[in-house]
Amino acid sequence: MRDDLDLHIHTSHVGCANETMSLPALLARCEQLGRKHIAITDHLNGPQHIEPQSAIHEELPSYDGPLSITWGVEATIADAESGAITVTAEHVGRFGYDFVIAGPHGRYEETDPDAIIAINHRLMLATVRNPIVDSLVHPWWFSRLEWDRGTMTWFEDMSRIPDSHVEELAEACVETGTSVEMNGGAIIHHARYTDRFKDDYMEYIAALSERGVTFTLCSDAHDIEKLSYATDAAQFLADAGVPDDQIAAPAVTEF
């Protein structure tokens, strides 16, 4: 079990993570948790995140500790029609990212369950086929706010997702070398996901693994107490039968 990794971590710089997630604090906690290799992957969703990304990039080289660190970024969908994401090759060149993670983050105004599934599948395929993307983030994650609105209350398991979607995603991942993320925070500890959903999700991960897909694992922590969720993601992959040699890790950044 690869509980030495955490490849999706947010910081207090961008603002989606709280004040506990300063770089010094989160790096110290990762050391305490026994992590060996982590990735800092804060959001770049638009111009408002350029300055915080610059601040992270300037601060990271001051770390002088045992952790191997990869400088990365998380993108979301910029255009649901084309599948374009918010991070471009120009951003990668400007900031020197060594790891780009991306994927859908919603239902994109759809209300019909089958339409929500269809658009998310289409956007996941577009993300995986984007040449700058290294890992598809938290497949089939939806905000808990959608349950509060009543738009995702039907999503108690994965029975509506066609088997063909698994086949198509696996084929695209293997063809492009893009990994699928196992996310402790967004999936395992999601406030609205049922045990039945998580059982189905384990079968989903196992099916992708059987077809040769590789995986990254992470906490997706926005609070320092949730950095431990990467261990839960590692255990989930192990329980799904994913061998360690199908768990991917990006190159370590040389600052």
Give the positions of each predicted feature.
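Charged catalytic cores and adjacent phosphate/nucleic-acid-binding surfaces used
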Residues: 1-12, 21-23, 85-97, 143-145, ...
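A generic hydrophobic-helix recognition signal that picks specific residues
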Residues: 1-3, 35, 67, 131, ...
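Alpha-helical scaffold segments that flank or form the walls of functional sites
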Residues: 22-39, 59-63
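Residue-level marker for buried hydrophobic side chains located in beta-strands
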Residues: 3-5, 39, 71, 135, ...
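Extended substrate/RNA-proximal surfaces in nucleic-acid metabolism proteins
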Residues: 44, 49-182, 238
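A short, flexible N-terminal coil/short beta segment enriched in small residues
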Residues: 32-51, 221
